[in-house]
């Protein structure tokens, strides 16, 4: 059976002096959150793991943003360990991965290769064809060509953000909720449709307006 998995990662910053040749990137993963959905887009299971970075450090800004501390990540598994756990959780077989933007796929792919993690056991995760950028999907549905925030997309879908943003599992849950509503209502534009209906309802036809003005006037 094919798995539908929503993934969200949180990252810390790698200072320039630590961006060695074997890791020439600005960010490093410190948390992976994932939600599994069935074929009807109902949430069936959840996964979350902190990740111990090899090069990056959590500064004050990242700690305030994510709520993740140095202590939490120092006791966490490496990226390879966290990914092994996640892949075991997903199970064998085909999978479709949903994320909010392409960042998650790009960062995961970069780190797997830079840290020389066995690519064969991560093959399903490294295949770009298995990933859906739902930020792009939502942008097209709502006619917004710019990079929509998840919070804005939820608003357009007439939904509220649940929990604190910038927690990998919380963001994955909210993305999954949005996906479920949009996929179950493929023709709906939600807030935009309702506003258009109200606009049309409140707009009096020109003919009716003229008729009202001329009513009772003898010509």
Name these PLM-found stretches.
Residues 63-66, 73, 136-170:
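Active-site-proximal helix-loop-helix substrate-binding element of RNase H-like nuclease domains
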Residues 11-13, 136, 174:
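Short, glycine/acidic-enriched loop or turn micro-motifs at the edges of active sites
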Residues 103-129:
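Substrate-recognition/cap helix-loop segment adjacent to the acidic, metal-dependent catalytic center
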Residues 2-110:
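Conserved non-catalytic scaffold segment of RNase H-like nuclease domains
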Residues 14-16, 139, 177:
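Conserved protein kinase catalytic core
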Residues 177-219:
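Acidic two-metal-ion nuclease catalytic site recognized across multiple nuclease folds
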């Amino acid at each position: 059976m094919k798995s539908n998995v929503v993934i969200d990662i949180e990252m810390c910053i790698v200072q320039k002096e630590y961006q060695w040749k074997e890791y020439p990137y600005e960010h490093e993963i410190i948390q992976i959150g994932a939600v599994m959905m069935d074929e009807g887009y109902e949430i069936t299971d959840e996964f979350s793991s902190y990740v111990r970075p090899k090069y990056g450090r959590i500064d004050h800004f990242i700690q305030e943003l994510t709520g993740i501390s140095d202590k939490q990540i120092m006791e966490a598994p490496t990226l390879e360990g966290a990914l092994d756990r996640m892949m075991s959780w997903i199970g064998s077989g085909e999978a479709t991965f949903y994320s909010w933007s392409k960042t998650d796929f790009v960062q995961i792919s970069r780190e797997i290769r830079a840290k020389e993690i066995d690519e064969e056991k991560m093959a399903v995760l490294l295949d770009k064809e298995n990933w859906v950028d739902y930020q792009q999907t939502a942008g097209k549905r709502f006619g917004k060509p710019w990079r929509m925030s998840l919070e804005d997309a939820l608003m357009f879908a007439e939904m509220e953000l649940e929990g604190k943003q910038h927690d990998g599992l919380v963001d994955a849950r909210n993305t999954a909720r949005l996906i479920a509503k949009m996929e179950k209502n493929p023709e709906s534009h939600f807030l935009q449709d309702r506003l258009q209906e109200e606009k049309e309802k409140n707009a009096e036809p020109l003919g009716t307006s003229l008729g009202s003005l001329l009513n009772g006037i003898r010509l």
